[in-house]
């Protein structure tokens, strides 16, 4: 079906709005497992820390895989087609997960959900690039701002909902809403599916693999996200409950602060660029230093038994640079040819989620060493101190690599 350019743009704008709704829940889904139900999985289903970490991190691995497997096709097949694939997978995985009790079935559902979530992001990014090419970074930041309020909803409000109706019913609701959003996309998609662009799909990827500055950026930024998401999705709420004996609502409120900061920072970046006179490296390097300071502050809080406010300060320091994904995307875009924008963002996101998954697994292994010392599922402070030693070393590596990322902006 051939439609006018004006109607095509209007339809794509409506589809983009539905994509933002999906991204709200894909962002929320990153921290749903284990997140608020860590203790439920531990006490109700008798999962070990390693199993809980595995069920949570499989989402991140498949999310990362989607960035390459689907990312290399995003510029050829168009945002709407990519969005349909991702939205369908994400919705199905989200709907079926609450009905599972076996760790293998849970893992399969989370794997499907993660792959779908990553594909939704690529479809959304491609749509934004098609509709707002000149203002790509700014509009992507706005979309991420809305999406990142998903984790905010997934903390205190969701904890209250779980207490009221149980975690299974509470976790079914996001899937039902996503099904409605997908229905809207299906109604609007006619005439918006672009014709496949011919060409060698893997050539841009091979070219990018040889781009040393791109990989310096990817690894340095990925370390930032790996550290942040260990707290957001794995142990942030639990370590506050365990070590400081705060109730689950106050603990989840602390994690909420992280989500709010990350959400807001996606649009603050443009203001920071003006202050830095367009310098990318100044902002990026300052971000890596904040992560190192945050990791060391968290280590001090557990090792020296400092106030919970010290740990919250550490969380805040870690959250600031984790909210700069739209900024990192600008650098990735500038380090590669314009026609490879979609793939550049995909490779950046792939790197981030590989490290998020790895850090999730490693956190489970580290806490597992103190399994025998855990009383009623509560880990000792030494376990969290060991975890923050690992995070601090990782943050130092991010700082070193960040110093090698070249400047791509203009003063």
Q: What function would you assign to each model-found segment?
A:
Residues 15-49, 65, 70, 231-237, ...:
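Extracytoplasmic
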Residues 34-35, 212-269, 356-364:
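Extracytoplasmic gate region of multi-pass secondary transporters
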Residues 46, 78, 99-105, 116, ...:
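Helix-breaking motifs and short loop linkers at transmembrane-helix boundaries and internal kinks
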Residues 65-104:
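Conserved MFS/SLC helix-loop-helix module at the cytosolic interface between two early adjacent transmembrane helices
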Residues 66-78, 265-279:
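Helix-to-loop junctions at the C-terminal end of transmembrane segments
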Residues 103, 109-147:
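Cytoplasmic helix-loop-helix junction between adjacent transmembrane helices
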Residues 119-132, 323-337:
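Intracellular juxtamembrane helix-capping segments at the cytosolic ends
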Residues 139-190:
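Helix-loop-helix hairpin linking two adjacent transmembrane segments in secondary transporters
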């Amino acid at each position: 079906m051939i439609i006018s350019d004006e109607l095509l743009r209007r339809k794509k704008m409506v589809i983009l709005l539905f994509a933002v709704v999906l991204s709200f829940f894909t962002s929320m889904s990153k921290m749903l497992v284990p997140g608020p139900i860590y203790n439920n999985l531990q006490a109700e289903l008798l999962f070990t820390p390693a199993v809980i970490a595995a069920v949570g991190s499989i989402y991140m691995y498949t999310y990362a895989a989607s960035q390459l497997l689907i990312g290399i096709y995003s510029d050829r097949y168009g945002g709407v087609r990519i969005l349909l694939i991702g939205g369908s997978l994400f919705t199905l995985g989200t709907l079926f997960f609450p009905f599972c009790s076996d760790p293998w079935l849970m893992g399969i559902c989370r794997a499907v959900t993660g792959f779908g979530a990553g594909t939704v992001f690529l479809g959304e990014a491609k749509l934004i690039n098609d509709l707002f090419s000149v203002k790509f970074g700014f509009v992507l930041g706005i979309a991420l701002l809305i999406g990142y309020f998903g984790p905010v909803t997934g903390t205190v409000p969701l904890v209250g909902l779980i207490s009221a109706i149980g975690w299974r019913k509470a976790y079914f609701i996001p899937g039902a809403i996503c099904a409605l959003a997908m229905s809207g996309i299906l109604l609007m998609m006619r005439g918006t599916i672009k014709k496949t662009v011919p060409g060698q799909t893997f050539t841009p990827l091979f070219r990018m693999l040889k781009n040393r500055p791109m990989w310096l950026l990817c690894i340095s930024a990925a370390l930032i996200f790996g550290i942040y998401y260990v707290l957001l999705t794995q142990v942030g709420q639990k370590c506050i409950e365990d070590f400081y004996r705060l109730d689950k609502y106050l603990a989840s409120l602390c994690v909420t602060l992280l989500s709010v900061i990350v959400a807001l920072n996606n649009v603050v970046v443009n203001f920071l660029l003006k202050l830095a006179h367009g310098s990318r490296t100044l902002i990026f390097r300052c971000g890596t230093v904040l992560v190192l300071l945050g990791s060391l502050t968290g280590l001090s809080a557990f090792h020296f038994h400092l106030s919970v406010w010290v740990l919250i300060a550490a969380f805040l320091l870690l959250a600031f640079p984790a909210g700069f994904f739209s900024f990192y995307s600008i650098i990735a875009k500038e380090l590669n040819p314009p026609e490879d924008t979609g793939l550049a963002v995909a490779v950046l996101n792939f790197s981030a989620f590989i490290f998020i998954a790895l850090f999730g697994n490693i956190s489970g292994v580290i806490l597992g060493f103190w399994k025998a010392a855990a009383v009623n599922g509560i880990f000792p402070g030494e376990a969290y101190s060991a975890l923050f030693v690992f995070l601090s070393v990782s943050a130092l590596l991010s700082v070193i690599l960040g110093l090698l990322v070249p400047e791509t902006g203009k003063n």
